[in-house]
Amino acid sequence: MLIAALHFWNISTTRLHLKFGMLTPTLLDVAAITSLKPTGQTFDPEGYESEISFDFKRLAYGIFIKEHHNTESAEVTDEEHVAFLTYWLSMYIFCTRSIQVAKGYKTLAIQLHEGRNVCLSKLISGSLYESLNQAVISIKEYQSGVA
């Protein structure tokens, strides 16, 4: 059903073109579905310094969690929490196409860990539009035999 709906998605207008008019997911729709506030600070990764750091050598999801989960202590360390948030953002919130944790979400994870009021619904909305556009491009390439 989703693939059928994507046939109505227009990349240039980022809208579904239906018989009764155009339709698009809005920031309020994302906020309602995810229970995230549509307000908050805009995420800015530039110039943000933090003392929290961890190893990004092995990024496959399973290995990443095993390497950043301390089983010796019941308390969650800052590094563990940031690693989990990075994993969570990469796999479940922004649904990266890779089978690895995306390093790009580390700064956002650190800011969330430190309690910064980041407006995630704007980021998710943008990611949704980008994913819909990419899905439509993939469908068209498959249908034309390019892929």
What are these model-predicted stretches?
Residues 14, 24, 140-146:
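Helix-rich DNA/chromatin-recognition modules in eukaryotic regulators
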Residues 121-125, 129-143:
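Extended amphipathic alpha-helical bundle segments that form the ordered cores
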